[in-house]
Amino acid sequence: MGLFGSFIAKFSKDRASSQDLETFKNLLIEADIGAAFADEVIDLVKKADLSELPELISKAITAKLSTKNRELKISSDRLTTILIVGVNGTGKTTTAAKLAAKLKNEGKKVMLAAADTFRAAAVDQLVTWGNRIDVPVIVGKPNGDPAAVSYEAAQRAIQESCDVLIIDTAGRLHTKSDLMDELTKVRRVVEKLTPIDEVIFVLDGTMGQNGITQAHTFAKATDLTGIVVTKLDGSTKGGIAISVERNLDIPIKFIGTGETISDLREFKSEEFISELLA
C-alpha cells in the first residue's frame, strides 16, 4: 500500500485523533516528503471531509511537482549528448548504462564515454555494462583528463553517426569546488563540437534532504535539465520525489527501481500519485 493509502484506509470512517495525526506526520517526514509539505497534508486532514481526502491530497501533490517537460530532449538531425552527473555511490554509472540500453532498445545508435577517469572501478563497470548491452564505450588513460575523454567521445560519436552520446562524468562531492570546476570544463570542451542537450543529476533516493543539498550545488555549477532518482524499490520512499521537485523545480525524468538493466522507468506524475494514494 502507498504512502498515503494506508492512512486514508484507516481513517476513511473515523476522524483522526491528534496522536494519529502526529504519527502520520512523522511517517511523512521519514519518507523524505519534507516537513513543510507534511504540515500541509496534516492541515488538509484536519479540515477536510475524509471522503474528499484522496482528491485533495492528489491536488496538493500535483501543485508541488514540476510542470517542465519530462521527456528526454532527443535531436532528430544531429548527435544528442547527455551528461550524467552526481556523487559517487548514487548509482550514476549504472544509470548511464541503463539509459543507454533503453535508448538502444528504442532503435537509437548509442555510445558511452567513461569520463570518471580517476576511478578505475567506474571505468571497468561501464565497460562491463557496455559489453553486456552491446554499446561501445570510449575510455581514456587512467587518471587522464575527463574533458579530453569527453571530447574524443564526441568526435567519435559524430564520425560514427551515433544518435546519442552518454557521458558518465566523475563522481564528485558537491563540497569540492575544483571537481565542480572540472565538470564545467567538460561541458565547455564538448560544446566546441556539439551542444549538450541534457545534464541529468543522479539522486540517491535514500539520502533524503542531503541529496537535495547536493542537487542544489550541482545546479549552480551546471544547468541541470533533469533528475534520476535511484534506489526507489517501492512507493514508501516516494516522498523524496515531491521534496526534490518542490525545492528545485527540475523535473524527475526517470526512477531507478532495482539493479537490473531494465530497472529504469520514466517518471509519470499521474502514476506516481496513484501509487502514493493506493
Where on the chain are the PLM-derived regions?
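Primarily NTPase-proximal linker/entry elements flanking Walker-type ATP/GTP-binding cores
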Residues: 3-115, 122-143, 147-158, 163-167
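Amphipathic alpha-helical interaction elements
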Residues: 13, 29-33, 46, 171, ...
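Short hydrophobic/aromatic residue motifs in ordered secondary structure
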Residues: 35-37, 119, 233, 261
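Short loop/turn motifs enriched for small/polar and acidic residues
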Residues: 85, 170, 204
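Short, glycine/acidic-enriched loop or turn micro-motifs at the edges of active sites
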Residues: 89, 117-119, 171, 207, ...
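Short low-complexity stretches enriched in small and charged residues
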Residues: 90-94, 120-124, 181-186, 209-210
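Ser/Thr-centric signal marking residues that sit
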Residues: 93-95, 117, 169, 175, ...
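Conserved catalytic-core segment of NTP-binding enzymes
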Residues: 146-160, 174-278
